[in-house]
Amino acid sequence: LDLGRLYNEQRFAKGVTMAEVSQSCQRMLDDLLAGRDATLLDNPHYRLNIVVVKSHGLLADDHRGRLGLGLSSVIADNLRGRARLSRHFERLIIHDPRQAPPLHPLKDFPSRSLDLELGNLRQALLASGSIPMVMQGVRDLPGAGAGTYRDGGLLDYHLDLPYHGDDIVLYPHFTDRVIPGWFDKGLPWRRSNPQGLQDVLLLAPSREYLARLPYGKLPDRSDFKRFVGDDARRNQYWQTAMSESQRL
């Protein structure tokens, strides 16, 4: 609830820069954690896992022109085959050292893991939301080495991962479709691996539930543009949706 409130309170003027959005998100993270960082690492019930990608080539640059060229190359390669994204990204799973995530060895893309600790927690959280052209990448993530780290959803948009074990994986989601990567959103033929999801229980909003929300959808990042200059109306819409989700 605190995160929802803080995110709802964000204000972005037309023409906001990547640096300004990153600074705003850093302040939001500071307000959210408020010196309680350690509680995320010693929670007795939950183990935090954060997925980011290390960006290669032009994707390591936050200059709009060079970054735009890099993204164009990613889009073209992704159309030829998802495996070609290994030229552009390396997957990094930053996890609670008390328990590694329950995954089979990751062989689809270059991947590695890193222990989550106080020294890299905030940078990892910030990197996990660093969408290219929206926010700056996070430089030189502590423990991960030099480089530019961005939102792990670029590779693993909906966590189409090879889970192992006999337990059921509960996946609260915002849609009833599992889309492998960010660049697959407009590719209806790019589907998740059914074998990897055979023990996944997907919990998603029904069409009837969405129809009852203002504008017939969940709030999303595009609302900042939709309601630019009218944050009061966006706040009201988002608060209504959050209240409905809390009731649900």
Model regions and ranges:
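Patatin-like phospholipase
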Residues: 2-248
